[in-house]
Amino acid sequence: GSEMCIRDRNIVIAIIFISVIGTLLHFMYEWSGHNKVVSLFAAVNESTWEHIKIALTPTFIWTLYDGAVYGLNPNYFEAKALSILVIIVLIPLLFYAYQLITKKAILPIDITIFYLTIIISNLVFYYIINMESLHFFYTYISVIVLFIIFGSYMVLTLLPIKNFLFKDPITKRYGIRGHSHHEHKEK
């Protein structure tokens, strides 16, 4: 019926919105003249974490829309939490899996992984939204997971963990210090 048509349209719009905003966020920190506020939401270096972040930012923004449309759905928080976890897990999983074979990063593959992850994330969201109502326990856990993810997302740019996910492969640094403009300034 018409409800399914609206949902089909919403999934396509979600994928396009998240993909376009995510792509722009790859360059936004540079374009903003290295604005600290922009650094919280945009990629500040070429690390895997920053590529996860630029998929999460538009997903969080899209939550303002899908929360209004689907927020009363009993599976909304489960759908949101799992769709976000798909992004957090799938980007590094696919990125490091193909590099085991190629031994190096290949830009067209990286870009494909980014968009493919956004598509899969949204398919997971819409699949769970359309399932039979899940137990309230899962809603409770999902809300906690969402708070943890959002809190971590806000903190990790400013205080990156010193591991491979956060290390810029070019500058070998972390967080904002991993941005290539720091290389030129520090003499």
Model-based region annotation:
Residues G22, H26, W62-T63, A79-Y96:
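Small-polar-interrupted transmembrane alpha-helices in polytopic inner-membrane proteins
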Residues P108-K187:
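C-terminal, well-folded lobe of enzymatic/effector domains
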Residues N73-P74, A97-P108, N130-H135:
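Membrane-interface helix caps and helix-loop-helix hairpins in membrane proteins
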Residues R7-I16, Y138-V145:
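Alpha-helical transmembrane segments and their helix-start/interface "positive-inside/aromatic belt" motifs
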Residues S19-G33:
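Alpha-helical transmembrane segments of multi-pass membrane proteins
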Residues L40-K53:
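Short aromatic-rich membrane-water interface segments that cap or initiate transmembrane helices
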Residues G1-I6:
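Short, small-residue-biased leader/transition segments that mark boundaries at the very start
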